[in-house]
Amino acid sequence: MTQKEFNFSIYNTKFYGQYWQAKETSAVIVLAHGMGEHSNRYQHVAKKLTEHNFSAVAFDHFGHGKTEGKRGHNPSFEAVLESISKVIEKAKEFFPNKPLFLYGHSMGGNAVINYTIRKNHQLAGTIATSPFLKLAFKPPAIKLFVGKMLQNIVPSLTMGNELDVQAISREKEEVKKYIEDPLVHAKISPN
């Protein structure tokens, strides 16, 4: 397995990306991470994929990991979908004429499902694990009202995402790594 880094820019933001190349690539999987995470947290997934002749391409979303920007903020959901388009372009550049799959987890799962529905560019398939399709709880009406107001007034305002870190995995070591990872954050913006 060979690992390489790359960058691209959209919305005046420099994105960090990386890819893992299998010895013989049969297909490519573009990975979209979850809220507060970054692409490096999926190295173990990339390793397993390359062992089965799948190369993997991943990137850090707006305001995540090594990508520039305020932690937890993105300009818009459309901008998130455009960033996925850019990574797909990069994947096609690195691995021409190979079948391409999208894989997303949690927030990334929501993004890849929406991308597939709205912009499917000849994808071989889409995989989503624990996709964020709706909130796990119903927030108070006042919180929803204030959130919608803030989205129009101060869209880049970030606040805690209220994620229960203990619930991200049943493996205590995985939870510990998540908590201790300096590139993981617990921020979210109204956008």
Model regions and ranges:
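Catalytic nucleophile-loop/oxyanion-hole region of alpha/beta-hydrolase
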Residues: G36-S39, G65-F95, P99
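Conserved alpha/beta-hydrolase
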Residues: R41, A46-K70
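N-terminal cap/lid segment of alpha/beta-hydrolase-fold proteins
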Residues: M1-E24
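The conserved beta1-alpha1 loop
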Residues: V30-G34, H105
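Active-site glycine-rich loops that stabilize anionic/oxyanionic intermediates
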Residues: S26, G34-E37
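Alpha/beta-hydrolase-fold enzymes
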Residues: M107-S189
